[in-house]
């Protein structure tokens, strides 16, 4: 039968999704989660008796059961149990101990040794490369633990620093045998498991491999990491990493490590597993012999099993220990003995040989310990055997398997490699070992390692305290007290047992296993009941006749051991009184005499006691699960564990273990009793309360009569309430006592009921609003007015009215907020206006809801967090960036509360009336007296180039030149447009001098190019392409400053479409379209322009702090902002980068350069262009600031740019032609191209505006304007560049609570296309909405100065 790879607890992948673990597992109380791994969660557990800590690994059984269905060989439990026994039998100072194993219906709980030192990985991370001497100390212990496992045919297969734990003394413990495998019958392992950085090439390649060799590779990687602080194979890409491992390619650290270390690493990281060094040779390598070894490590090495222990054949059947063979038979579920013998005689590794070696080593260790301890009181081995987890009591009464744990302990020594038997005290924990005279030494509670691994069949209440106590007290070892006579039979051959002896054994066993006072389903074990009732065993004897005959009885060699059941020893360990112990000793003595007359009984035999009893039960596996309690997994496994790893002594709790159903019934009765008492207490409390109320009512009536100031009917309830409060203080002592008792019984219910009347009154008064402060001291406020004659009536009535009014107002506000903000959020998530509106409205709602309490604090908050003042302040680029960021994103609290107050006080206005703050931005081109364009113009500035001349001269021929151009970039709704244009978002860098920046216009240009490329002529596309190219090349060079600001009201026109309801925006951002104070009217008058020229583009440059030369103060700018700025700006993109020697006021005829005209005549001595557009417009737009048409003007700028390219390549300054003159060139990258879209118009109402821009420029600019409003609800925009009309719609989910509508705008030419006419028509929908939209458009055109008056 193939047993090579049974379903493995550890190899199964557990997913313990639910956290419904029992609060305790046996004696272990589960605590916090220590971590999670591939095999499940690890919990910290504390022993309830000793306080010992352990780590409990929770393993889900669902995967195990799946594996069981796949493996029909041995069935699930046996494979798991074999692995558990292996882990229990692995007793080595450098291997983490397994103490107990418990199971519920859903999970297995592996109780492991808890080490406080953490992982070796953490040590490496914290300290980096270790000194060689320290690294070798850890490495030697890793190899010792690994060699120990390999000698027994066990491979870890997942060695890595994370699985190497350190105890408090910084000794290494191999942990997490989750991938561990038994090499079976010399077969190679096939599972590719482990961690990629530490996995061997053969595992990575998916080849069959020897587990031992793969562990050596992992140890080599660990050695490399210990010495260098890094891994030999590492790569971010897992595939590349695996390829490196497969090829064995790594860089040997020459300078960092010694020659010996390099040699060992090279031999361990050998790709060919056949040539890889073995653990035995590693221990003899010069690197390890170079440094002295600690005594513990020396002892550990000397006590290692022979490397071939798990591999070599046992030679002949004569060499096979019959007792161990019988153990193996039971472990493999009564597998034929011949098959097991065949496996033991084969060469090579197999599980049978591994178990044989482990058990033999265990047996020798027991004998060594026995010889080292003087015999104490005779204690029977079988008194432990009776505590097996068999399902049936020995008298034939079926029992549930009790919750218990695997108390399999680990052998201390095997056949020692050098000196068999010498290593009994060899390991670090040898103190414990030699103090134990028998296998009890290895039982979990007696385990020197305090191994929490216990047999799943053991009682849940076994105390691991013995794990400690045995370390100090050898006398507590059951085997330490064993008589020499018990040992004399150990080596006798197995003999058949007569039936009468078997009956006697079962008789004695059952007497102790089932005291009559306990339910028949109790686990079989001698208990303290036997001490108190020494005659009870005789009561149970008749039941023995019911025990069915067991055909194996006559062949079982060790039955008589069970006849000697000495609870005295156990009781002495548990701490029972000496009298009881003595009586039990006498009983044990009698049984020992009877046993001594039986031939062939070995008292200290390593074989399982009562083998036949368990064999009888081994075929029956219909055991039950108990969710609340844990249990052993199978009868045969219990047999093996009980026999081999002697049962421990039990605590008193152990003896009280009852049937789960009975326990459940008792618990239910207890709860019901509690409920009944509670109910009775509540009834009593209520009755007392009623009596009390009646007494108080009588007193209140009497007192009200005495006072004679109130009407009786009204007075009763109120006075009774008042009296009730007083009475709570002045109660008679008797009453108070009763109430206290009742209150305790009713668990606090009574106390709450005492306040019922008062609470009701308070609730009545507070029903309309939030609670108000209670002033119980004054009777005026503790009662309601009795009648209209009561002096309190007026105050009370006013208070009620105020609260009702507040509640209604709040209700109205909430409904308004819900109706407005929900729809706004639905569509306009990017609109900062709606976002800030929501923020402020929500905050406002909270303030209003708390108005009765927080009014004072609101006022205080206004002073604590005043609205930041930005007007007329000089701010650096960085500071402006931070202001924009914090105002809009990170510091909303700073503006919320002041805004809330302002919002209440400020009148509702259109956005066109909002003041724009004048904020200056410092750069080396600005003095402190120079005002920056408005803050928002920073966002709306479309484009300014520093070296337009070179661009004009070679727009497409020299793209590399564009990389050298530093263009200011201001963030408008750039991210939105980038998304729409499919253009990668540029990198922004904030620069204080503001010089190396790219204008958003490039982006807008790119968008416009995409939108209108179909209609554009090749000339237009060329112009736009050059712009886009400049932009792209430049952005790739990293010149474009990256704005740290989130997308703000991205430009002036982003903010223009603000309705009355958008108060936040008005208060917070002061839209750039709004009128400004006279102080800001002359913004442009104070801007110094470069000597070369002053186009609008140059103004943009100045605004962005990007102009390279000084500026003169313009004097005329404020008189006619619109046309002058537009046209120059249209040309401005071309000129801005050139030295600005000429001002806007010059006649266009006076200049023949390729440079467009500057912005408004900033110098009086220069004449404006002849075109009427160059005359100062009426003071319509005193603030040229956030001019949305700066984008507009860019359209003409582009055209002129092309003009000048075609006309001349000279760099002399020349005034720009008027818009009329440049009309044919302008189609190319008109700024309004941004906003184009179209929808179907219908004649509802017509609005016409005459503008001074040519038709194509106006079309592009207007489309750009509308497009920028898309965040606020405009949608479906279409721009027909052939027919020059724009169609669009306003969504019903707009930011301003306007109704939806559709509109159409047609641009017609005038004056030979030097000017244009805008015709706005409502197609369908709300007339109010279209009127609002057209009015906003008109305001923007007016502000920009492009309306032709």
From Swiss-Prot:
GN (gene name): GIN4
Active site, per annotation: 158 (proton acceptor)
A Gene Ontology cellular-component term: cellular bud neck
Enzyme class: transferase
Binding, ATP: 34-42, 57
Sites bearing Phosphoserine, chain numbering: 10-12, 15, 294, 300, 303, 388, 390, 393, 407, 409, 413, 455, 469, 473, 477, 485, 556, 634, 720, 746, 891, 973, 999, 1059, 1074, 1077-1078, 1080, 1094, 1097-1098, 1154, 1218
Keyword Zinc-finger: no
Species, as recorded: Candida albicans (strain SC5314 / ATCC MYA-2876)
Molecular function GO terms recorded: ATP binding; phospholipid binding; protein kinase activity; protein serine kinase activity; protein serine/threonine kinase activity
Cellular compartment(s): Cytoplasm; Bud neck
EC code: 2.7.11.1
Protein name in the entry: Serine/threonine-protein kinase GIN4
Family: Belongs to the protein kinase superfamily. CAMK Ser/Thr protein kinase family. NIM1 subfamily.
Keywords assigned: Apoptosis, ATP-binding, Coiled coil, Cytoplasm, Kinase, Nucleotide-binding, Phosphoprotein, Serine/threonine-protein kinase, Transferase
Described function: Serine/threonine-protein kinase which regulates the localization and the function of the septins during mitosis. Involved in the formation of the septin ring but not the basal septin band. Phosphorylates septins CDC11 and SEP7. Required for the transition from pseudohyphae to hyphae. Acts upstream of IRS4 and INP51 in regulating cell wall integrity responses. Involved in propolis-induced cell death.
Compositionally biased intervals (Polar residues): 406-418, 426-442, 471-488, 1024-1040, 1134-1149
Compositional bias annotation for Low complexity: 1-20, 369-384, 443-470, 570-585, 1202-1215
Oligomeric and partner information: Associates with the septin complex which consists of CDC3, CDC10, CDC11, CDC12, and SEP7.
PTM entry text: Hyperphosphorylated during mitosis at dozens of sites. Among these, 7 have perfect or minimal CDK consensus sites and are CDC28 targets.
Residue positions, PTM Phosphothreonine: 69, 191, 397, 412, 778, 869, 876, 941, 990, 992, 1056, 1095, 1106
